[in-house]
Amino acid sequence: MSTIILGLESSCDDTSAAVIKDGYLLSNVVSSQAVHEAYGGVVPELASRAHQQNIVPVVHEALKRAGVTKEELSAVAFTRGPGLMGSLLVGVSFAKGFARSLNIPMIDVNHLIGHVLAHFIKAEGEENQQPNYPFLCLLVSGGNSQIVLVKAYNDMEILGQTIDDAAGEAIDKCSKVMGLGYPGGPIIDKLARQGNPKAFTFSKPHIPGLDYSFSGLKTSFLYSLRDWMKDDPDFIEHHKVDLAASLEATIVDILMDKLRKAAKQYKINEVAVAGGVSANNGLRNSFREHAEKYGWKIFIPKFSYTTDNAAMIAITGYFKYLDQDFCSIELPAYSRVTL
């Protein structure tokens, strides 16, 4: 009998459902919320309401594209955290009702682990390389910046992490200061491709070990803009592509410096990147350069698997299903969860 997992993701502002059959992805439907753009960030109450409106049609579409009926499902995997509590509750509540009505198991998935395991998503007939355990994963998003030692799908160790702001958060805030809009990541990425990454210099943190810090960079960027704009009120408009390129290059250098140290310290040459910031062109290029220079075997996810999606939840749920690792229907959502 086939194992068919429905995955649900609702941790922030994307409602997503995916179906995996015997380890192969059949469908992955994502509904993003444009309502937040006018506010320059995600509004939790609006996100929760949008999830309530989207989750039923998204699940229906995922099952339809997969050619699967709900009665064929083996289990429901869902994001339990971390994330916005109101958003998480929509997915968790739907999963509970859905699983109970079908009398099938529930599988809780840590959103961060889902990002790491996105490298194991594959469609039938698709040729894609997957990392071998153990491997290193640079997990970078709006809320997290971590270097993770992945020993197994259910055995991960954080080697280093941000002590303040995440890389994605720093990018978004600097973008907002420049008046570029939200979300800042894709905007900075697009502008940076046209600019000179060495045009401006911003401070880099001196943090011991493998931990990160981005609050100092954010402050340096803000104060530099303030000083430059005293002489030229239109400084940002005149230099925005170079500002974006220099900011991106600084953040990528900070991320890769610690990752190099981790790879050398733990003697690992299989290195992956995951999370929303892994879509950044500068970071992806730096990974390729490191692969050539240091002999790394690198793993860069498809763009569709960098942002929040249910495919990563479904594949994690599939691995847990094989181990019969189910959760109680009473399990609550958790807004704060670590690896």
Regions found by a protein language model. Name each.
Residues 108-109, 271, 288-313:
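Conserved phosphate-binding/catalytic loops in two-lobed NTP-binding clefts
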Residues 151-194, 219, 223-229:
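Glycine-rich phosphate-binding loop plus the immediately following alpha-helix
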